[in-house]
Amino acid sequence: MNEENIDGTNGCSKVRTGTQNEAALLALMEKTGYNMVQENGQRKFGGPPPGWEGPPPPRGCEVFVGKIPRDMYEDELVPVFERAGKIYEFRLMMEFSGENRGYAFVMYTTKEEAQLAIRILNNYEIRPGKFIGVCVSLDNCRLFIGAIPKEKKKEEILDEMKKVTEGVVDVIVYPSATDKTKNRGFAFVEYESHRAAAMARRKLIPGTFQLWGHTIQVDWADPEKEVDEETMQRVKVLYVRNLMISTTEETIKAEFNKFKPGAVERVKKLRDYAFVHFFNREDAVAAMSVMNGKCIDGASIEVTLAKPVNKENTWRQHLNGQISPNSENLIVFANKEESHPKTLGKLPTLPARLNGQHSPSPPEVERCTYPFYPGTKLTPISMYSLKSNHFNSAVMHLDYYCNKNNWAPPEYYLYSTTSQDGKVLLVYKIVIPAIANGSQSYFMPDKLCTTLEDAKELAAQFTLLHLDRERNLFSLDLCRRIWRK
């Protein structure tokens, strides 16, 4: 190492040589007893630490660190992160030049230490005017595989994935809501490591790879949000999936009351899953053990504890498009005045522009267009074979949402009024026939528009938001990245 670097200790801006860098790292190793090796573009400090016995820490113990000054190294970083707890391994990503790449991964020995690091070191001023970002690191080992023939069984999918990719550990397949003999057209494949999953994803490039003669969809599976153990210890609501569409809330309540009459407070069923609320946690945990794997109306059910999330913070993230689609088994506890909880799933990212100027400006058009060369091969497809992120319009999102749930298209009814200054103001009422007999017979926003396009777009946005908040109905594309144990 012969490059020069800035020594930022105590906020200094003193140039230090490569020899000084090496001396500082050697001093750190001598002081801590940790080893340090550099391989594959990263420098590993520890892993395991001296005297460590047993397996590595479980998932959830590692944090990601971003916005690290490029001339800052382990001798400065390790003492900062040791404030949160014992470091199992510190991995600093390195450039060939000897500078770091601006980010690192820190694995602690416990999840509690990792959570503490996030709380005390996120947005920490590591140098004057330089703030680092710290968040949980998810070592993703699962892939979403879509467009799978619905008649294929778990064993067939597992065997096929083992043939075409390496390191397959398990396959998660959910039965169709309407026909339990078929799957939902997608599966989650778990690999032995993140590297194995990444290699499989690279091999299964959409459009170039087929299974059983079908072009499949491949993407990373987004793991559920982690809920801290202390919060989970207070949960007294069970999440029940794989129910028959025809199964009623009364039937579910009766089945869960069998092991202890009167234990169930109420049941909220949504399509093929439900939330079962108990008066106390002990009964909920006991019922989970008894009922998991049992049959109700001929369907083998899965029962887990529902995962609570913070209502206010979650909705703020949700409306900003920052929350992952963890849908069904996330439950937002309502205020005490409210009689029912609200379930939560991810809304499509919708256009915020409702000013009558729907035509993109020239720069916007340029960003979303590509040259169409003569002789380019075109393939006819259905819009419903696309992903939801291909749509910028809430109207298209709503149509797509209904189709994915096997509903009839939404019906739009136009109404008008006149403002005090003589303007004609418009509003659409939307009826979704498939759920029109439920608690919500139609959807109509509380604002009026001056153009047809804006009125229709606003009504569709309002309907999507309301569906998501009040019903959280299953949608394949919106839920395609969810995985559960």
UniProtKB/Swiss-Prot annotation:
The gene is RBM46. Keywords: Cytoplasm, Differentiation, Meiosis, Oogenesis, Repeat, RNA-binding, Spermatogenesis. This is Probable RNA-binding protein 46. One of its GO terms (molecular function) is RNA binding. It is found in: Cytoplasm. InterPro entries: HnRNP_R/Q_splicing_fac (IPR006535), Nucleotide-bd_a/b_plait_sf (IPR012677), RBD_domain_sf (IPR035979), RBM46_DSR (IPR044462), RBM46_RRM1 (IPR034434), RBM46_RRM2 (IPR034435), RBM46_RRM3 (IPR047837), RRM_dom (IPR000504). SMART domains: RRM (SM00360). It holds the Pfam family DND1_DSRM. Essential for male and female fertility, playing a crucial role in regulating germ cell development by ensuring the proper progression of meiosis prophase I. Regulates mitotic-to-meiotic transition in spermatogenesis by forming a complex with MEIOC and YTHDC2 which recognizes and down-regulates mitotic transcripts for a successful meiotic entry. Required for normal synaptonemal complex formation during meiosis, binding meiotic cohesin subunit mRNAs containing GCCUAU/GUUCGA motifs in their 3'UTRs regions and positively regulating their translation. Residues 61-139, 141-223, 236-308 form the RRM domain. Interacts with YTHDC2, MEIOC, MOV10, CNOT6L, DDX4, UPF1 and PABPC1. It comes from the Eukaryota.
